[in-house]
From Swiss-Prot:
The gene is recF. Pfam families: SMC_N. This is DNA replication and repair protein RecF. ATP binds at residues 30-37. GO terms for cellular component: cytoplasm. GO terms for biological process: DNA replication; DNA synthesis involved in DNA repair; double-strand break repair; recombinational repair; response to UV; SOS response. HAMAP family: RecF. NCBIfam families: recf. SUPFAM superfamilies: P-loop containing nucleoside triphosphate hydrolases.
Length: 357
């Protein structure tokens, strides 16, 4: 599915824009601060309900306006879908699909699977475990229909359990929460383990092409001891959890450990190599989705040329073309992306929030 049309109103520095898009490559060229990243962020927000540069809604809505409005048209193999998102300064959202209100942001996320590659995206590799859990959970969300409901219930129960830890004195008082929590934790961990095992070969193959000088390994850590039932872990650690006032073990502590030649990648790879690895992982994830479900990702790439030499840019471009997916690329100069252009691509110029093609 590709985004054929995008309407933006009062988002960042963009007052209004109406863009007819290519199902292939779309290039956004402009100086720093022109608004090209804002276009990428508008697409991301339309599919996630939140921006990727700021969690503060006031910074995303254009100055002195009350709300932003985003609309898009998605073209699938058999039908077209109209989607819309409005969000005001109070953080209240309205999601519209095919003319009807009352939909959830998760429905937009399902309709628009996308991969984001930005200069800030290094957190996938050198940030905390939560960023790699998000990587795994993206895959589980798009591959397991029951994942989102289970994940939402897990978050709710963990919050309730942590609150209860401040009040209880005996483990038996926690059993009502743990009775619900344990099967959810085990199911989510199983889904994550299966997904990480399934995508491992894709990640290894793509990384070998991008970083042939390193031997990369991927290891899923579920968040508690191997070969130990989660129920046993919770009961055994009750006193420690009560002192900490939070649950110290579980799927909320899971990680995907990534190593290069046996060492953590953040300690081994240069910044340019980290970007290549990030690109490789995002590509592998998108290609795995296509193979498993027939669906294609949208790829959003901000500041394409940074950290990459000509050879590596060419490699990334060729791999993106091979996916036959829709790709949005921002760059300071058209020279950085001209080699990626073909007769089906579109080039947009962005200047002070104004977009022309």
């Amino acid at each position: 599915m590709s985004l054929t049309r995008l309407l933006i109103r009062d988002f960042r520095n963009i007052e209004t824009a109406d863009l007819a898009l290519s199902p292939g490559f779309n290039f956004l060229v402009g100086a720093n601060g022109s608004g090209k990243t804002s276009v990428l962020e508008a697409i991301y927000t339309l599919g996630h309900g939140r921006a990727f540069r700021s969690l503060q809604i006031g910074r995303v809505i254009r100055h002195e306006q009350e709300a932003f409005v985003l609309h898009g048209r998605l073209q699938g193999e058999e039908r077209e879908t109209a989607i819309g998102l409005t969000k005001d300064k109070q953080g209240d959202s309205k999601v519209r699909i095919d003319g009807t209100d009352g939909h959830k942001v998760a429905e937009l996320a399902h309709l628009m699977p996308m991969q984001l590659i930005t200069p800030e995206g290094f957190t996938l590799l050198n940030g905390g475990p939560k960023y790699r859990r998000a990587f795994l959970d993206w895959g589980c969300f798009h591959n397991e229909p029951g994942f989102f409901t289970a994940w939402s219930n897990l978050k709710r129960l963990l919050k309730q359990r942590n609150a209860a830890l401040r009040q209880v004195t005996r483990y038996e008082q926690l059993r009502p929460w743990d009775k619900e929590l344990i099967p959810l934790a085990e199911q989510i961990s199983t889904w994550r383990a299966e997904y990480s095992a399934g995508i491992a070969a894709d990640m290894a193959d793509t990384c070998k092409q991008f970083l042939p000088e390193f031997s990369l390994t991927f290891s899923f850590q579920r968040g508690w001891e191997k070969e130990t039932e989660y129920a046993e872990v919770l009961e055994r650690n009750f006193e420690r959890d009560r002192q900490l006032t939070y649950t110290a073990h579980g799927p909320h502590k899971a990680d995907l450990r990534i190593r290069a030649d046996g060492a953590p990648v953040e300690d081994t790879l240069s910044r340019g190599q980290l970007k290549l690895l990030m690109c490789a992982l995002r590509l592998a994830q998108g290609e795995f989705l296509t193979r498993e479900s027939g669906r294609r990702c949208l790829y959003l790439i901000d500041d394409f040329a940074s950290e990459l030499d000509d050879e590596r840019r060419g490699l990334l471009a060729s791999r993106l073309k091979a996916t036959q997916s829709q790709v949005f690329v921002s760059a300071i100069s058209a020279e950085h992306v001209i080699d990626m252009s073909d007769e089906n691509s579109k080039m947009f110029t962005v200047e002070k929030g104004k977009i022309t093609d």
